[in-house]
Amino acid sequence: MPQTRLFFRSNGAPAREAFSRLEAAFEEDGLPLAIRELDEERDIHEVSIYASEDWEGVADRMRSCLTSIAGLSEIETEELPEIDWVAHSLAGLKAVRAGRFFVHGSHERGQHRAGEIPIEIEASLAFGTGHHGTTSGCLEMISRVVPREHPRNALDLGTGSAVLAIAIARLAHIPVLATDIDPVAVRVARENVRLNRAAEWVETAAAPGFHHPAFARRMPFDLIVANILARPLIGLAPAMARHLSPGGSLILSGILTHQRRQVIAGYVGQGFRHLTTLHREEWVTIHMKR
């Protein structure tokens, strides 16, 4: 289905405020949002939201959210051709080395070094090829935590391509439940699990949050990895505490540097303690224990 990009421009501070409001307003809709700097010298930023249907309704909701912010340009629209933009932009990217892992496409199969664990992930509609700072940060943290703590039952919440679930399974040879709210991502995850010969350990399921019978059957987990976004991570903190065994480890990412303290505070309030933070560009990956 073709997409419509709705966008506007302003100086940095109003743009960031607008982006935060839109992120909160459209959180339940799952619409992609983006903010980028167009002109550093003049401090001009552009905020975009992408809609596959009813873009007029989206535009009305945007205006309602943003009426009190001064200095924003009019909302403009741009029709985008029907292209798998993820595959289009990621095709041909070089392999990523993160921790013990060598994440690659089929064109670099067999090029891993001695001691590296190869994971083959093709560009697709599911997030997670290892190139993003959140994914590489999680892979690095998994490489540190798993050999030291020897978990026996793991969860990858918001699995996307299943690269993190596959990494845990290939490194530790333990059962991993990999879930995602998006059925397309779950289908891609299942294909990647088979491709990487991890089906013996990884179970996939389409589930919003912790709402699936598999959780009751598989809990408690002694390792949970969640690479989503800061706001939903904070909201999930009580459920994380219920599903993680005492002494278990939590690896969180999808968190911008300025959101780190807020996320940590949300989990400390649920009885977690912060151990380590990894920084990858503007993103952080956090290791906590219960």
UniProtKB/Swiss-Prot annotation:
SUPFAM superfamilies per UniProt: S-adenosyl-L-methionine-dependent methyltransferases (SSF53335)
EC class (word): transferase
Record organism: Chelativorans sp. (strain BNC1)
Function: Methylates ribosomal protein L11.
Gene of this entry: prmA
Annotated positions binding S-adenosyl-L-methionine: 135, 158, 180, 227
UniProt xrefs under CDD domains: AdoMet_MTases
Family of the protein in this entry: Belongs to the methyltransferase superfamily. PrmA family.
Swiss-Prot/TrEMBL catalytic activity: L-lysyl-[protein] + 3 S-adenosyl-L-methionine = N(6),N(6),N(6)-trimethyl-L-lysyl-[protein] + 3 S-adenosyl-L-homocysteine + 3 H(+)
GO molecular function annotation: protein-lysine N-methyltransferase activity
One GO CC term, this protein: cytoplasm
Protein name: Ribosomal protein L11 methyltransferase
HAMAP family: Methyltr_PrmA
InterPro entries: Ribosomal_L11_MeTrfase_PrmA, Ribosomal_PrmA_MeTrfase, SAM-dependent_MTases_sf
PANTHER family per the UniProt record, alphabetical: ELECTRON TRANSFER FLAVOPROTEIN BETA SUBUNIT LYSINE METHYLTRANSFERASE (PTHR43648:SF1)
Keywords of this entry: Cytoplasm, Methyltransferase, S-adenosyl-L-methionine, Transferase
Compartment annotation: Cytoplasm
Enzyme Commission identifier(s): 2.1.1.-
Predominant localisation class: cytoplasm
Transferase in keyword set: yes
GO biological process: methylation
